[in-house]
């Protein structure tokens, strides 16, 4: 690869790294071309971009970012990067599901919002709720609280009326 082409790749990868909420490094050595195409298709369905990049070019692209030195140990052998733009957990789900039937795909490391996760954290990452799911749950809790306020007020009013009625009966 010529120098200007390498610089272009570094620039593109740097831009993708800046835009990504989640970055996942994988090893794909031993995956057939057909399996790799299948994996890319699964990533595409999940809204994730998956790209094979040389380790030296990834290192250069990461040099601008904080915590890049923590990802350096994972940049050995063949490396592909999964960029999670909208959902930082989507790549973890795809990798987990795909690696169950394809042992050649190996998760190396991930960085989500500057926090680095090792290969042992993939199961936990894949089970996390998405931002949308968390917002939905929070909205449901708030809705339940708001809906229960009138019931509590009605119960207090009913009890007050009952007490007043009892006092009135006692005075008669």
UniProtKB/Swiss-Prot annotation:
Biological process per Gene Ontology, one example term: translation
InterPro entries: Ribosomal_uL10, Ribosomal_uL10-like_sf, Ribosomal_uL10_bac, Ribosomal_uL10_bac_type
UniProt keyword terms in alphabetical order: Ribonucleoprotein, Ribosomal protein, RNA-binding, rRNA-binding
GO cellular component, one term: ribosome
Pfam families named in the record: Ribosomal_L10
Coiled coil stretches, renumbered: none
Single GO MF descriptor: large ribosomal subunit rRNA binding
Assembly with partners or alone: Part of the ribosomal stalk of the 50S ribosomal subunit. The N-terminus interacts with L11 and the large rRNA to form the base of the stalk. The C-terminus forms an elongated spine to which L12 dimers bind in a sequential fashion forming a multimeric L10(L12)X complex.
Functional note: Forms part of the ribosomal stalk, playing a central role in the interaction of the ribosome with GTP-bound translation factors.
Family from the record: Belongs to the universal ribosomal protein uL10 family.
Protein name: Large ribosomal subunit protein uL10
Organism: Chlorobium luteolum (strain DSM 273 / BCRC 81028 / 2530) (Pelodictyon luteolum)
């Amino acid at each position: 690869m010529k120098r200007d082409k390498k610089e272009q790749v570094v620039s593109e990868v740097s831009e993708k790294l800046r835009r990504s909420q989640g970055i996942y490094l994988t090893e794909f050595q031993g995956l057939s071309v057909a399996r790799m195409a299948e994996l890319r298709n699964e990533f595409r369905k999940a809204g994730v971009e998956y790209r094979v990049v040389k380790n030296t070019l990834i290192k250069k692209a990461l040099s601008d970012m904080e915590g890049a030195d923590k990802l350096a140990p994972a940049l050995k052998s063949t490396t592909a990067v999964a960029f999670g733009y909208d959902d930082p957990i989507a790549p973890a789900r795809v990798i987990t599901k795909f690696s169950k039937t394809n042992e050649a795909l190996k998760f190396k490391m991930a960085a989500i919002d500057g926090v680095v996760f090792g290969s042992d954290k993939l199961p936990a990452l894949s089970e996390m709720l998405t931002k949308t799911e968390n917002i939905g749950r929070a909205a449901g809790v708030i809705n339940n609280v708001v809906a229960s306020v009138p019931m509590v007020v009605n119960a207090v009013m009913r009890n007050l009326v009952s007490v007043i009625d009892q006092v009135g009966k006692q005075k008669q």
